[in-house]
Regions:
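Bacterial N-terminal signal peptides that target proteins for export
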Residues: 1-12, 20-22
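Formylglycine-dependent sulfatase
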Residues: 13, 17, 24-269
């Protein structure tokens, strides 16, 4: 285990136990905690209501008010797949080997939900996996599985030709190894699958771990119709460094300049 993580966890447990009555400690130690882990894709660090006035994220704001916020947290990589692999393995990119979004392999890696499952937890994964390849097949360590290939689609007909849509074709989800047509906006649908499992698909006598991995707000972001005009009147100021100008490029080698137009960080190597 990461020494820092171990120290933080030990300190947290110590605070809880120190403040608990003696009679309650045995019960506290005996009952495992349920865990819900929510991952949002490509969300800027400050695009939450409690950090930026005008943004409407009431549920995230509630968690910030009633939980712990880590203002100095960083990811091990600014790329999608390497970051996901680090979350699931606790390893740095050079150790787990998932170094890009398209050509890496997760073969031989072990994920922490496997250990939770061995410890008696019911485990569920719902959402975007995308860890170096496009497969949506169920992965080890999960009792319940809902995913899609690669980046997935915001809407069921995204990426399909008009004649395909007319013929009834839809983007597909993998639900416990079976192909199921996507029915609606992906954020809503993934949330519905997660809630269905929490309320009806598990054994309520056992602890659970739910990993809800949303596609949104990955570029090119497409909001559902009900939110299309939500920020129409909000004045959003873009950072000066965002512009692809001579001033921003001055003194930078070409490979650095090219990364400004890169989807996966290595498109020009």
């Amino acid at each position: 285990m990461n020494p820092m993580l171990h120290a933080v966890r030990a300190a947290a447990v110590a605070v809880v136990l120190a403040s608990a009555p003696l009679g309650a400690r045995a019960a506290t130690e005996a009952k495992p905690y349920n865990i819900v882990f929510v991952l949002v894709d490509d969300l800027r660090f400050d695009t939450m209501g409690f950090l930026t006035p005008g943004l409407q994220t009431p549920n995230i704001d509630f968690l910030a008010r009633n939980g712990v916020y880590f203002p100095n947290a960083v990811v091990c990589s600014s790329l999608c797949s390497p970051s996901r692999a680090t979350i699931l393995t606790g390893m740095t990119t050079r150790n787990h080997g998932v170094v890009d979004n398209n050509n890496s392999s997760e073969k031989g890696l072990e994920f922490f939900p496997q250990y939770l499952r061995e410890a008696g937890y019911q485990t569920a994964f719902v959402g975007k996996w995308h860890m170096g390849e496009a497969s949506d097949a169920p992965r080890p360590g999960f009792d319940y599985w809902v995913s899609f290939r690669g980046q997935g689609s915001y809407f069921p007909t995204d990426g399909l030709l008009p004649q395909q849509v007319a013929a009834g074709a839809r983007q597909m989800l993998n639900v416990n190894g079976q192909e199921v047509p996507q029915k609606g906006y992906i954020t809503d649908e993934l949330t519905d699958y997660a809630m269905q499992w929490l309320e009806h698909g598990r054994d309520a006598t056992k602890p659970f771990f739910l990993y809800l991995s949303h596609k949104a707000v990955h570029s090119e972001a497409k909001p559902p119709q009900r939110y299309e005009l939500q920020y129409a009147d909000l004045d959003i100021k873009l950072p000066a460094s965002m512009a692809n100008t001579e001033e921003n490029n001055r003194g930078k080698p070409m490979w650095v300049r090219n990364q400004r137009n890169s989807w996966h960080g290595a498109d020009f190597f």
